[in-house]
A protein has these predicted regions:
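N-terminal strand-loop element at the rim of the active site
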Residues: 1, 20-66
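Nucleotide-activated donor-dependent transferases that construct or modify glycoconjugates
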Residues: 1-7, 11, 116
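Short amphipathic alpha-helix
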Residues: 9-22
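Carbohydrate-associated surface elements
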Residues: 33, 155, 176-177
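A short, charged, and often flexible helix/loop element on the N-terminal side
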Residues: 47-74, 82-92, 122-130
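Short N-terminal targeting/anchoring amphipathic segment
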Residues: 72-96, 106-112, 148
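Membrane-proximal helix-turn-helix segments that form the acceptor-binding/catalytic region
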Residues: 131-150
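Acidic anion/phosphate-binding donor-loop and adjacent secondary structure
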Residues: 161, 172-184
């Protein structure tokens, strides 16, 4: 999440969702305390604490907290109705959380997963063998059963169906929201 910048479109989509819907819903976001692949944390945020960022509360997790143990601690300490996972191929966040859920370490009512184009033929072609193995293991472990899938378009919904089959029973198509103009 902000102040990150490397994830491009998916980050803008999340920021726009929070800023458009933040008066109606409370957003608690858990993210890394640094740009992915960088060793130094952000210098303008409180690490391993909640920070107010726009219309969201953001927890910038240190490497120790951005782990299975840390996620378990954060999830069990917060009240939430829905968990929104902003990636499919993220073993350190989405995968870790879904394993906790699968083996009963965290309880949650609803989970929405947004693959953000990760199932398009072009995206699947990059590191194809690794992704194919990840998908097969995830299916075998039933990590993605019972989720609500969010697609940005009908094309993306079809890509999800093509890869996940009957596992993706509920797919909601919700186009990306536009930026909110800053208040004057």
């Amino acid at each position: 999440y902000l102040p990150g910048y490397r994830s491009g479109g998916p980050l803008r989509t999340l920021v726009n969702m929070v800023e458009n819907l933040g008066d109606e819903f409370e957003f608690l976001i858990v993210t890394r305390d640094r740009v992915f692949g960088v060793s130094e944390p952000y210098n303008n945020v409180k690490i391993d604490q909640w920070n107010e960022v726009g219309k969201a509360q953001v927890f910038y997790a240190s490497p120790l907290m951005f782990s299975v143990t840390g996620f378990k601690k954060i999830l069990n300490a917060t009240s939430h109705d829905v968990i929104y996972l902003n990636s499919f191929f993220s073993p350190h966040s989405t995968g870790a959380f879904l394993l906790l859920r699968r083996f009963g370490f965290v309880k949650t009512k609803s989970i929405v997963i947004a693959p953000r184009g990760e199932f398009s033929p072009g995206a699947l072609g990059l590191k194809a063998a690794k992704k194919k193995i990840y998908i097969q293991v995830a299916k075998l472990l039933r990590m993605y059963h019972g989720l609500i899938w969010q697609a940005s378009s009908e094309y993306e919904a079809q890509d999800i169906r093509n890869i996940m089959g009957s596992i993706a029973r509920v797919i909601l198509v919700a186009p990306n929201l536009l930026s909110v103009a800053p208040a004057v």
